[in-house]
Amino acid sequence: MDVARDMEKNTTAMGQLMSSSATTAATATGPASPKRPAGRTKFQETRHPVFRGVRRRGRAGRWVCEVRVPGSRGDRLWVGTFDTAEEAARAHDAAMLALCGASASLNFADSAWLLHVPRAPVASGHDQLPDVQRAASEAVAEFQRRGSTAATATATSGDAASTAPPSSSPVLSPNDDNASSASTPAVAAALDHGDMFGGMRTDLYFASLAQGLLIEPPPPPTTAEGFCDDEGCGGAEMELWS
């Protein structure tokens, strides 16, 4: 009887000890981590939203160009790394012109005549890809060189136009305007006097007039008939000068 009672006590104590150990372990481990959602892991998009074959590389903000080789599934041609997305897009156009010619899909329509790149042989394999890469890089470098030369020429012409000497046109002050307006009536009066006296100076005109008054009158005509009234004057001559 006593033995059975002791065994029951031992069993109860062991059960309590095991329950306490399980609670302590659950508290130490904490709540279970949430399950990771199934599906493809998201990654940061580096491709350019507009240009073909262009994507961003690293945190430096540079752009790389990589094109797919036509007729070769899974093969890609690394063209190079560039400072701007536009340069990488031009490199893509140069590489595609070398690989596909006039049927190439271009980022810029004017690349067909602005980029001078030779067409690769039709049966070119992987051995020709380095030549295509070199030709594309040289075409882009030449295009950038032409652009910088044109920009320098435009800036030089603008500086020359800004440093040109000013025109030597006379500058009139308000005093000059008043003087010209004041001299206008005097000139008009002088012209009026000239027209009045037949283009002769005023002093010469009056001098000739005084000289004319000093001239002796002409002698009376001898054959002229006398002046008669209605009753007749009997042919008597009348002196005109007293």
UniProtKB/Swiss-Prot annotation:
Specify whether NADP is a keyword of the entry: no
Single GO cellular component annotation?
nucleus
Region (Disordered): which ranges? 20-44, 143-184
UniProt GO molecular function: DNA binding; DNA-binding transcription factor activity
Q: Which PROSITE patterns match?
A: AP2_ERF
* Superkingdom of origin: Eukaryota
UniProtKB keywords: Activator, DNA-binding, Nucleus, Stress response, Transcription, Transcription regulation
Major location category of this protein: nucleus
Instruction: State the InterPro entries in the record.
Output: AP2/ERF_dom, AP2/ERF_dom_sf, DNA-bd_dom_sf, DRE1A-I
Record localization: Nucleus
Q: Where is the composition biased (Low complexity)?
A: 20-29, 148-184
* Keyword Nucleus appears in the UniProt entry: yes
DNA-binding region boundaries: 50-109
Report the family membership. Belongs to the AP2/ERF transcription factor family. ERF subfamily.
What is this protein for, i.e. what is its function?
A: Transcriptional activator that binds specifically to the DNA sequence 5'-[AG]CCGAC-3'. Binding to the C-repeat/DRE element mediates high salinity- and dehydration-inducible transcription.
The protein in question is named: Dehydration-responsive element-binding protein 1J
Q: Which organism is it from?
A: Oryza sativa subsp. japonica
Q: What is the lineage of its organism?
A: Eukaryota, Viridiplantae, Streptophyta, Embryophyta, Tracheophyta
**Gene that specifies this protein:** DREB1J
